[in-house]
Amino acid sequence: MNHFELFRLPFQFELDGGLLSTQFRELQRRFHPDNFATASERDRLMSVQKAAQINDAFQTLKNPISRAEYMLSEQDMDIRGEQKTLQDPEFLMQQMELREELEDISDASDPESALFDFEQQVTALYKSQLSALEQLLNQDDWEEAADAVRKLKFIDKLRYEIERLEETFFD
C-alpha cells in the first residue's frame, strides 16, 4: 500500500491539504498505540509500526518536494538523496546570480526592503517551478519531472537561506 492509498487519496501531485490532515488525524486516532495497550505484544508492535508508517507518509505527502520525490520513486525513479548534478547551465547560472544577489543584500542601503523584494522574486520562481513540476507529473513525464524536482530543491534551499538572513535582520 503506497502513501496515497493509505490516506485514500488519488495518486496525483495536487492534494487537498485539508483532506490529507483529516485523514491523518483519523488514522492516527485509529492506530494510536494507546488503543492497543491491553492487546497482545504482536498487536502492540503492529500498532507502533502502523503509527510510524502513518506519520512518515503524512510528512512525505504534506511537503511538495518530498511528495514529488515519492511519486517518482513509485515509478522506479528514486531521486531522494541523490547527488546528481543538474545539466541545465542556464538554470545553474541563474542560481549563481541569485545567490550573489542574496550575498549583496546585507550591503544594500535598505537591506530589509531589498530582502523583501528578493524574497518576492524567489517565491515567484518557486511557484512557477512548482506549477511546471505539477504539469510534468500529470503528464507522466517522469524524467523531466525529476529534473524539475532537482531545480525546485535548489530554489527551496535558496528560500531557506533567505529565512536565515531574515533572522539576522529581525533578531
Swiss-Prot record:
Keyword field contains Chaperone: yes
GO molecular function term, any single one: protein-folding chaperone binding
PROSITE patterns (alphabetical): DNAJ_2
GO BP: any one term: protein folding
Family: Belongs to the HscB family.
Pfam families recorded: HSCB_C (PF07743)
Alphabetical list of Gene3D superfamilies matching this protein: DnaJ domain, HscB, C-terminal domain
PANTHER family linked to this entry: IRON-SULFUR CLUSTER CO-CHAPERONE PROTEIN HSCB (PTHR14021:SF15)
Gene Ontology CC: iron-sulfur cluster transfer complex
Description of how the protein assembles with itself and partners: Interacts with HscA and stimulates its ATPase activity.
HAMAP family: HscB
Every J domain range: 2-74
UniProt cross-references to NCBIfam families, sorted A to Z: hscB, PRK05014.1
Descriptive protein name: Co-chaperone protein HscB homolog
Function text: Co-chaperone involved in the maturation of iron-sulfur cluster-containing proteins. Seems to help targeting proteins to be folded toward HscA.
Keywords, comma-separated and alphabetical: Chaperone
